[in-house]
Structures are given as structure tokens and as C-alpha cells.
């Protein structure tokens, strides 16, 4: 969005070369997706746990965007038309923010946003990873995207349901 607003900055941080931010780490209780992991790789990790997300994942943006855009960028951007946020919120995802001065803090994704393209991140904080709990045995997840065109279109409606049927 820097180019759309014609802003100029003294420094710009490119997180895509930070190896720590490009990792998907599988833990027993959760998947940790680095902020610089491409959308393609992030959705591959998610569909490995939730195969029913495959169709939703292939409708997320166009292939060039999925191969170069990052999940952290999509989440931090906070656009209300972003399809990753409803999915990640339904999956009970948490975001990890890091500051050199204060260390890391973790919060539910829905608590990140305060308004249109606004969030609680401090000027010295960086979104470093998204933590997605593994599915429960009784979980039923469904994701739907309705748009005018099938390929590469913003959602008119994005609906994600995650029910724990015990």
C-alpha cells in the first residue's frame, strides 16, 4: 500500500529474506506459520490438516499473488476484503508480535484489529508468526467464498464455520 498512498520512507524492512519468518513449524498442539511464508505454502500446511479447505485455498487470490504474497502480510494489512482473516479466526488462530524492546506477545487474531486497516501493533512491533491450533476430533470446518468471478476476485461473501460437535 506504500505505492498507492505515494508515501516515502527513510527505511523499508523486507521480511521475506528472514529465514525464521519463512518457516512452517509443526508442533504437537499447533502449526506455527511464519509471517513471511507464502500464501501457497501456508495453505498447503492448513489443507494438510483440513483437506476440506482445498477448494477455498485455490480460490484465494490469483496464483501469482498466492506464490508471492505472504500470510503475515495479508493478516497485518487488515483489509476487510481479506479472506484469510475469517478462516484464521474460525480456526482460533493467534498472532505473535515481536518487539526488540519488549519481546514477544501473543493474542487472538480477532483482537489484532481496531478498525479499518488499523491494528494494535506498536510502531516497533513486527508480526512474526500465526499460531493455528490443530483440529479437534469433533471439529467440523467449512469455508465458502462467493464472488462475481470464480478466479482471482474479491469475495462478496466469505463464510467460515467451525463447529465442535461433541
How does the language model describe each region?
Residues 1-166:
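C-terminal structural segment of proteins
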Amino acid at each position: 500500500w506504500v505505492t498507492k498512498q505515494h508515501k516515502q520512507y527513510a527505511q523499508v524492512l523486507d521480511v521475506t529474506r528472514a529465514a525464521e519468518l519463512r518457516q512452517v513449524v509443526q508442533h504437537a498442539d499447533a502449526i506455527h506459520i511464519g509471517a513471511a511464508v507464502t500464501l501457497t505454502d501456508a495453505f498447503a500446511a492448513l489443507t494438510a490438516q483440513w483437506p476440506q479447505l482445498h477448494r477455498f485455498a485455490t480460490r484465494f487470490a490469483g496464483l501469482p499473488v498466492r506464490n508471492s504474497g505472504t500470510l503475515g502480510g495479508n493478516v497485518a494489512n487488515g483489509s476487510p476484503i481479506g479472506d484469510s482473516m475469517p478462516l484464521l479466526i474460525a480456526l482460533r488462530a493467534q498472532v505473535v508480535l515481536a518487539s526488540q524492546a519488549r519481546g514477544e506477545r501473543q493474542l487472538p487474531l480477532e483482537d489484532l484489529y481496531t478498525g479499518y486497516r488499523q491494528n494494535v501493533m506498536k510502531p516497533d512491533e513486527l508480526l512474526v508468526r500465526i499460531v493455528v491450533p490443530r483440529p479437534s476430533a469433533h471439529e467440523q470446518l467449512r469455508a465458502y467464498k462467493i464472488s462475481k468471478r470464480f478466479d482471482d476476485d474479491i469475495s462478496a461473501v466469505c463464510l467460515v464455520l467451525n463447529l465442535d460437535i461433541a
